[in-house]
Amino acid sequence: KTTGIYIYGSNYDIAGKKVTVNAESQVRNEDSKSRSFRFFAKILDADGKEVGHFDGERYTLKPGETKTVKVSGLLNNAHFWSWGYGYLYTVKTLLKADDGSKIDDVVTKTGFRKTQFGEGKFYLNDRAIMMHGYAQRTSNEWPGVGMSVPTWLSDYSNKLMVESGGNLVRWMHVCPWKQDIESCDRVGLIQAMPAGDAEKDVFDRRWEQRLELMKEAIIYNRNNPSIIFYESGNRGVSREHMLQMKAIRDEFDPHGGRASGSREMLNINEAEYGGEMLYINKSKKHPMWSMEYHRDE
């Protein structure tokens, strides 16, 4: 198995509207002989206009060999994804053989934003932002149709959160489906993404399953710019478990600018964000928000 395409920004210059775009992909040679190829990336803006074309180096893989290939380049006049501004680029990645023929290609919708966490604050594109929004059941259903909602209805309901002043949705307990994740990308709504959990920290095989699910969720959703927080559990987890969750993030999403944490984690230094339900409303180190302050259900 391979982990697919990973696209991320680096060397952000918000004022200068510049960012280095990086594209990576795991490639496996399943042929019986060595294969050589080059890795290319093309960037299209929201109107479909080509704004970047990056040529990678030549690679040769032996039979059965797996390697991560990379290409990067500077994007000028960049539009940065932000709250209420879901600007998305299309990145087309391509493997070409030495004779110029196409081996494989992937099209990825993504956006670029700069994040920073620390001193009790969260910065988005060099501006401190106070987190306020909604803790929504991941089913996100509507009366009459339940969870079987069309794409436009996902956009409508998620945009309602933005238009009401919310900049964050904390999905409850389990990872949201791709339609909602992509919808939040479009409407400019920050997401806190859980993997799958119960009401509290667990152990043994149940914890192993949560780790496995977080790995799969990160790989599946790491190109979606609206996901900024990875939630390790509905409530606090142990320091050891927090370190395990961060290790998964560091392995599969080391450059995505996302924080790993959980509610009730303000006393765990290794957590990168925290939150409470009642009474505690500030933090010296961890960015935090009141995660279930108003339980009008």
Predicted feature locations:
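Secreted/periplasmic carbohydrate-active enzymes, especially glycoside hydrolases
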Residues: K1-C175, S183, L213-M214, I228-F229
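Substrate-binding/catalytic cleft of secreted carbohydrate-active enzymes
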Residues: D155-E163, N167-E297
